[in-house]
Regions:
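Short, intrinsically disordered terminal tails adjacent to the first/last structured region
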Residues: 1-34
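Terminal transmembrane helical anchor/hairpin motif
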Residues: 2-8, 15, 76-95, 217, ...
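Secretory targeting signals
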Residues: 22-23, 30, 71-82, 87-120, ...
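Aromatic- and glycine-rich beta-strand/loop motifs that create alpha-glucan
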Residues: 27-63
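Membrane-interacting alpha-helical segments
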Residues: 39, 43, 47-54, 144, ...
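Hydrophobic/aromatic residues in alpha-helical transmembrane segments
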Residues: 112-119, 132, 167, 200, ...
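Helix-loop-helix units of permease transmembrane domains in multi-pass membrane transporters
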Residues: 121-154
């Protein structure tokens, strides 16, 4: 071989080795001191969290389920459009809107479960295994660790929302020539719902085990779902007690209120006139409830940071 030959070095690090290197770099003082320290450390933590999440089977199972869900939705949408080709355009648009709304409802449930199940052991699992000591004992603020992990999972959930909810909207647009009204508002509300559950799960993960954290979050999500039904039934039958119970459940966990606000933005007139159903919103949550949900998500993240700061490792 000549002296001028070019040597090509192929990287041989596995994903696990790369994650370990990122953690080591994150824990070093130079990683904190170089550049804007807190921002740099948070971004590095988010990258590590994202890569760790990519190794989990549940993430790929959820992605596969999401892809199959989109195939199922496209097949049903195509069959519906084919069978209603002879109907007036306005009737077909109503049908597309109803079908899209049902798909988004199912997609929001999948995204919510994804938020709870993938992050329930992000802190409790590392505390139990002792791997958190490799990071928490370094010159890295604990609240920065929580923020970095939240950012990593939030990025993952953003991609999942784009895959599921964005995929449903894109299929309705290209297959049915139907552009969802208020698309940015609807997408933001659905993302906020997932981010809300993510913050609650992380707050629970600082104190409870992974299984308990997931159970608490999903239990609160179920409470909000049932409370939303009770509130809609109370509004339909003019039962004030049921409406009050629904409002209280929304204050405890505003996830269902976010869905009903999104449903109000996209529901067709025919579905809205049908009365109470999971796909229609008889009693529309106010903008104040959306603001409350945003504050709820922020306070959940702050609570997670405070609890983790006080946790004896």
């Amino acid at each position: 071989m000549s002296e001028n030959a070019i040597r090509v070095q192929v990287p041989t690090d596995s994903l696990e080795e790369q994650v370990a290197k990122d953690k080591a770099a994150m824990g070093s003082p130079s990683a904190v001191l170089r550049g804007p320290g807190i921002l740099r450390t948070t971004v590095l933590l988010a990258r590590v969290t994202f890569r760790e999440a990519a190794r989990r089977k549940i993430l790929w199972i959820a992605a596969t389920a999401g892809a199959l869900f989109l195939v199922l939705f496209w097949t049903g949408l195509h069959a519906m459009l084919k069978s209603t080709a002879h109907l007036p355009v306005i009737t077909r648009r109503e049908s597309i809107s109803m079908m899209l709304m049902m798909a988004l409802y199912a997609a929001s449930m999948l995204t919510s479960m994804m938020a709870a199940l993938t992050s329930c052991d992000t802190l409790s699992g590392e505390i139990a295994s002792g791997t958190i000591h490799a990071i928490a004992t370094k010159p890295v603020r604990r609240w920065c660790l929580v923020l970095g992990k939240w950012t990593g999972f939030a990025g993952m959930l953003t991609l999942y929302v784009l895959l599921l909810e964005g995929g449903c909207m894109a299929l309705a647009c290209f297959e049915g020539r139907y552009l969802l009204p208020h698309i940015a508002v609807v997408a933001s509300l659905l993302w906020l719902q997932a981010a809300l559950l993510l913050g609650v799960t992380m707050a629970c993960s600082t104190t409870f085990s992974a299984l308990t954290s997931g159970a608490i979050t999903l239990g609160l999500y179920g409470l909000a779902f049932v409370g939303g039904w009770i509130e809609q039934f109370g509004a339909l039958r003019h039962i004030k007690t049921c409406v009050d119970l629904g409002i209280i459940s929304s204050l405890v966990m505003p996830s269902d209120a976010l869905w009903r606000r999104a449903a109000f933005k996209i529901q067709p007139p025919l579905l809205g006139a049908a009365g109470a159903s999971p796909f229609a919103s008889t009693l529309v949550p106010s903008n104040a409830m959306v603001v409350y949900a945003v504050l709820y998500a922020v306070l959940a993240l702050v609570l997670a940071a405070i609890l983790f700061e006080r946790r004896d490792l």
